[in-house]
A protein has these predicted regions:
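N-proximal low-complexity "stem/linker" segments adjacent to membrane-targeting elements
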Residues: 2, 6-67
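C-terminal catalytic/acceptor-binding lobe
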Residues: 8-9, 22-24, 191-279
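Anion (oxyanion) recognition and catalysis
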Residues: 54, 108, 237-238
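Residue-level detector of anion-binding/catalytic polar loops
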Residues: 59, 96, 113, 243-244, ...
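A short, glycine-/small-residue-rich helix N-cap motif at loop->alpha-helix starts
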Residues: 68-73
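Active-site nucleotide-sugar/metal-binding loop of Leloir-type enzymes
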Residues: 76-89
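Short beta-strand-to-loop acidic/aromatic patch adjacent to the donor-nucleotide binding site
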Residues: 87-98
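Conserved catalytic core of nucleotide-sugar-dependent glycosyltransferases
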Residues: 100-204, 211-217
Length: 279
């Protein structure tokens, strides 16, 4: 087994990716594009990804879908993914995110069934900003103090987060930057035949229609929490004893009225006492 020249170095870790791993991967980038639009920062990130993957010989494909209903868009993209047996991973990326292409390689390297990158919520927690000002935080660090992430970490009885090769186990994660192995959908289809639906959009061909399952579905869980379609997907998987992981070293920018940029690892270090433990 020869080692390819791919070596990723971050402030947290250094990893190597082999040529055999590169040959065995074929992710499908699934890009829900509301109103057929995407952001310029996302486009530049994805262009760099395409060029970088081409340089190292990593096969990939792309599927976009415009739908006003995000849950249906995600389910339709899953159907397209499952209909092509060459695809090994489904990589959801929301088109209002910008990212580092190396982080996708890092997610593949982790070799988890579901691996995510946590991105900031498009909101400012002004109470956190007020506390930061009182504590003498520098002005250019105030935004960092206000950021929250689309993720709920898992904690265990000893109050320590489960860690594996720098990744941490999480309770809920946003689908906006999520890598999913084919095996996940195979298991979920078998577990939830009642979620199969008849496509009436005309966006799926005959083969793809076989894989129309409402896995990304908003509903009220047993704790009376209203779950968004991404958290609903997480709960289906967890109820099958599946695990969801995130790499907290990944930095993502969520684009809205302003740019919300952050790393989950910084949030965990600075706010550990404020993190709620899911029941």
């Amino acid at each position: 087994m020869c080692i390819l020249f791919v070596m990723l170095t971050t402030e947290e870790q250094e990893i190597e990716i082999t040529s055999d791993e590169i040959k065995n991967w074929h992710p499908l980038f699934a890009l829900p594009c509301y109103d057929q639009q995407l952001t310029e920062p996302f486009f530049m990130s994805f262009l760099k990804t395409a060029i970088g993957f081409k340089e190292i010989g990593l096969k990939f494909s792309v599927s976009t879908l415009s739908d006003s209903l995000i849950s249906r868009a995600r389910n339709q993209l899953v159907a397209k993914f499952m209909a092509n047996k060459e695809y090994t991973h489904l990589m959801f990326i929301d088109v209002d995110l910008s990212f580092n292409p190396d982080d996708i390689l890092k997610m593949l390297w982790h070799d988890k069934e579901i691996m995510t990158g946590a991105y900031p919520i498009k909101d400012i927690n002004w109470n956190k900003v007020s506390d930061a000002v009182k504590n003498g935080i520098e002005p250019d660090k105030l935004l960092d103090s206000s950021i929250r992430f689309v993720v709920n970490p898992v904690r265990f009885a000893d109050s320590k987060i489960a860690v594996d090769k720098g990744a941490i186990s999480v309770h809920d994660a946003g689908t906006g930057f999520m890598l999913i192995k084919r095996s996940v959908f195979e298991k979920m289809f078998e577990e939830h035949p009642e979620l199969q639906y008849m496509d009436d959009t005309g966006l799926l061909n005959e083969e793809e229609r076989k894989y129309g399952y409402a896995l990304f579905n908003s509903y009220v869980d047993e704790d009376q929490r209203f779950l968004s379609e991404d958290y609903g997907f997480c709960r289906y998987w967890q109820n099958m004893n599946g695990e969801i992981w995130t790499d907290p070293s990944i930095e993502l920018t969520h684009l809205g009225r302003m740019k919300y940029t952050g790393k989950l690892i910084d949030y965990l270090v600075n706010n550990s006492k404020d993190i709620e433990t899911p029941e």
